[in-house]
């Protein structure tokens, strides 16, 4: 049922089944954050961050708001379903295609979640803010980096990594970076949200492993 790449729900099922067979642990390749706007840079040994997660491992179908009409309209579109079947059927992971599919759904899902919870004083908003506070500057840096790389990519500019960013964007503490983050606040929040949901799903897999 995954979207062409193993996800955290797959992991939860695996550890449960493995535990029943007497396994004591499951080994994983690194699952660090990579480069969502440069999906072919997919080596787990060359991450953009060793603290944050690769949110392509999120099980989109397990997220809140997935069943909303807006998200369902995206994922049930004929073209989307055709590409999804392609992603599932190829011999090796097509990282670019998987990224396109997941980002299309996640963008729609975040809009729904943002309007339902993050614009108001809700339990979900408080939990999200607590995650952001716990992540501190490191999370802000990661989310801002992802948003900046995406922005440059959309502008048709070279964006494979920070060495080719505009010079005043290469240091997180530069005023230009702060201005970008403020101007694109919702987009930065989007990438923070993905880290939050990835962490939540990984913890569920961890709890499944403990229970197994």
Each model region followed by its residue ranges:
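Acidic/aromatic-lined carbohydrate-recognition and catalytic surfaces
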Residues: 1-212
